[in-house]
């Protein structure tokens, strides 16, 4: 809410001596990992004894805990922009047949397992998502997800700790622990063939041990 568009956010980052804000999404086993990080100047180099660590922590908490939400929903125009970008990523993976073949292997081999779900989900799920449903998912994530906070730098982490402690104090947490279901045996082998016009075929094999 404090930084409703990229222009305002860029100005804030520039005011913090060119700080950098990044995010990424990945899968580690059966867990989906969302990483949001901010990096900037060490406190000892700032002017007027301003705590850059505190400012960066407040910025990060603002992004995580106070996104652009209105009437219980994300901003529709921003949602559509992100939806298009995500669908483009999925399309690009289809065009890269090596990545696509590996994805299809995991999809069919782990059909009824959490591990079989792609990190971005499916195009159908992305198209069906609404501003309201995503807002509810974000609220649920804040309550149930496991958070790991890493602070790296020469300056003391005290001020950063205070910022995050204050942010989490307003949330009723009920962390859900994930478990791994290992399926070692299968009753029958699967053979999946997809026919396409390609100059080079892709063969992928999966084994359980």
Task: State the predicted function of each range.
Residues 1, 146, 173-209:
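His/Glu-based metal-binding/catalytic segments typifying zinc-dependent metallopeptidases
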Residues 3, 120-123, 192:
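A generic, residue-level signal for flexible/boundary positions that often mark functional hotspots
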Residues 1-7:
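Short intrinsically disordered, low-complexity coil segments enriched in acidic
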Residues 8-176:
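Charge-rich, well-structured scaffold segments of protease-associated domains
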């Amino acid at each position: 809410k404090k930084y409703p568009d990229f222009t305002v956010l860029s100005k804030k980052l520039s005011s913090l001596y060119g700080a950098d804000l990044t995010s990424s999404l990945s899968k580690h086993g059966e867990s989906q990992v969302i990483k949001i990080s901010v990096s900037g100047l060490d406190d000892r180099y700032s002017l007027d004894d301003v705590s850059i660590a505190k400012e960066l922590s407040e910025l990060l908490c603002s992004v995580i805990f106070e996104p652009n939400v209105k009437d219980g929903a994300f901003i529709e125009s921003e949602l559509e922009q992100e939806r298009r970008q995500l669908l483009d990523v999925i399309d690009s993976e289809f065009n890269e047949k090596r990545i696509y073949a590996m994805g299809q292997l995991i999809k069919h081999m782990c059909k009824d397992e959490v591990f079989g779900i792609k990190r971005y989900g499916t195009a159908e799920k992305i198209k069906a998502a609404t501003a309201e449903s995503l807002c509810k998912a974000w609220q649920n994530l804040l309550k149930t997800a496991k958070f790991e906070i890493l602070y790296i730098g020469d300056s003391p982490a005290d001020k950063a700790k205070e910022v995050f402690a204050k942010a989490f104090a307003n949330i009723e947490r009920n962390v859900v622990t994930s478990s791994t279901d290992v399926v070692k045996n299968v009753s029958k082998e699967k053979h999946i063939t997809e026919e396409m016009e390609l100059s080079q075929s892709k063969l992928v094999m999966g084994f359980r041990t």
